[in-house]
Amino acid sequence: MNNTFSPQLNTAVNASLLAGKSVMRFYSRLDSLKITSKGFNDYVSEADQESELIITDALKKSYPKYKITAEESGSNDINSDYEWFIDPLDGTTNFIHGIPQFAISIGLCKNKVPILGVVSVSYTHLTLPTIYSV
């Protein structure tokens, strides 16, 4: 396996863990969570927004020339061979109903081909990093 992308993987793992701590703080106080409907059975909470901000800040700090596409804020205007994809709280509906089946997902593509990904399940403290070998 080619470990060329290990620094990016470490950055994504660390960003997901930081965001996960924030998400779990919100999960511990769901009764006061601010939630907005984006459509039928499609919600965004302040936990989604805070998680996305934490992740995008971490990725921008380490890789300022990479494009970022995130679920809540869309894409930045950077033209790059590398593009991060972020779902800051995959399973928002479960999350807001207190169902502990949600995760943070971060992926990185090079020339539109996936090269690494991280799924972090904060509730169970499980983080699954992957480097794709093509």
How would you label these PLM feature ranges?
Residues 1-89:
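N-terminal subdomain of lithium-sensitive/metallo-dependent phosphomonoesterases centered on the IMPase/IPPase/PAP
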Residues 96:
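Glycine-rich, Arg-bearing micro-motifs that act as flexible, cationic patches
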Residues 99-103:
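Conserved structural elements of the adenylate-forming
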Residues 104-108, 118-119, 126:
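Short beta-strand scaffold segments in enzyme catalytic cores
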Residues 113:
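Active-site neighborhood of HAD-like aspartate-dependent phosphohydrolases
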Residues 124-130:
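Conserved small/polar residues in nucleotide/adenosyl-binding loops
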